[in-house]
Amino acid sequence: MRRVESYAALAPLLSAQLRRGVVTNCFLSPADYQREIDAGLFYEEGDGFLLLLRQRAGYRLLNFYLHPGAKLCLPGQTLPLVTELACREKDQDAMRRAQDALCALGFAECFRRLRRTRAAVPAPNNAEAPTEASFEAVRAFLLEQFDPLTGCIPPDEELRQAVSAGQVLCLSDADGISGLLHYAPGRAQCEIRHLAVRADCRGHGYAGRLLAMLEAKTGGQKCAVWARVGTAPAEHFYEKNQFQPDGWQSVVLRLG
């Protein structure tokens, strides 16, 4: 396993993967790669495969390119590995084969997610304003509500930028943050990255208030969310608010 020193050094490796029949879960932009290189990006090249390992606090995220007939193997690891395999329905068979290859190396399925999309809606005129919360408070709340390895919590600098840009909408009370919605803006649509309500505040409409804040912030823009399958309250909330499955699904795997 070797560390990537620059995007210029990585680009030829990536170009070699652009062939028919290659299965991948890697959809990063050059800017994304540069951030990963700065934080710690490693790679392993083998017989029909390229693995990219992205450094996180106490674990690594795994991305892969698998050619037909690849003889997949993993470099020695001292940290847990997490990977997510996302695909449309027409690509399910190929991604299932990739999952089987990873599970043969010791990965275990954690859960599945389904992407739901809601068409644009009229922006509310009377949505309340979000309360301000510090980066430290937001980070602590996310770590309380989501698994630190599989919860897609951004690296500190990325999260700090999201807080500064107003992309983390909060409700607060005397006990701190009571509800939080973290979203990623986009030209065609926004995406909800995290939506959580503190345990003692659930069942009182907090999630709906946060969604109204998002609609006001984005002008009612089309919106997508990856929601965990089998979490009934979340599934009911999104269905009630017209978020419909759009054909994309994923499985989250972990090793270690």
Range-by-range predicted roles:
Residues 125-190:
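Flexible, substrate/cofactor-facing loop regions flanked by secondary structure
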Residues 25-80, 178-193, 198-199:
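Conserved donor-binding loop and adjoining core beta-sheet/short helix segment
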Residues 68-80, 197, 203-217, 236, ...:
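Conserved acetyl-CoA-binding loop-helix of GNAT-fold acetyltransferases
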Residues 106-119, 224-226, 244-256:
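Conserved catalytic-core motifs of GNAT/GCN5-like acyltransferases
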Residues 83-98, 224-236, 251-256:
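Conserved beta-strand-loop-alpha-helix junction that forms the acyl-donor binding cleft
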Residues 97-102, 237-239, 243:
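Conserved active-site tyrosine of GNAT-family acetyltransferases
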Residues 78-126:
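Hydrophobic alpha-helical segments and helix pairs
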Residues 1-29, 120-152:
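Short amphipathic alpha-helix that is part of the acyltransferase structural core
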